[in-house]
Amino acid sequence: AALAAAGYRYNSSINPTWIPTRYNNLRAPCSVSREEGLTIYPVSVSAPFRVPLFWISLHVMPLPLYKLLCRSALRRDGHLNLYFHPWEFSARLREPAFGVPGYLTHCSGTDLQRKFIRLLEWLKARGCRFLTTREYLGCDE
């Protein structure tokens, strides 16, 4: 209710998965829904096991596995809602001063950029369209 009262039209912060000490949203819907005046657009998870397809997953999973999980979400939901942070694509992520764990830095910077481009090319070849959240949900300005 607070988000709608503040003028927001959608909430895309729901991760419908279970991650120890972070999320326990296994009962949350995986597709677009409505709640308290807001459109809920959850982050994509695989089917049927709800493996999160968020930014960490692309870092740590082999691309063929990530694609397989994306395919399962596409079949169930008809869309993917993926998010990444700009800093993940920086080569500076590997610098000790940033204190980022090695499991994230081994595929960051240009390595992650290349992996991401291959993912986008694969999605495009499958006929996927790329839209902003606002376009996909049909939210007015």
Question: Model-found features: residue ranges?
Answer:
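C-terminal domain-boundary segment and adjacent tail
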Residues: 61-141
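Active-site-adjacent pocket scaffolds in enzyme catalytic domains
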Residues: 1-83
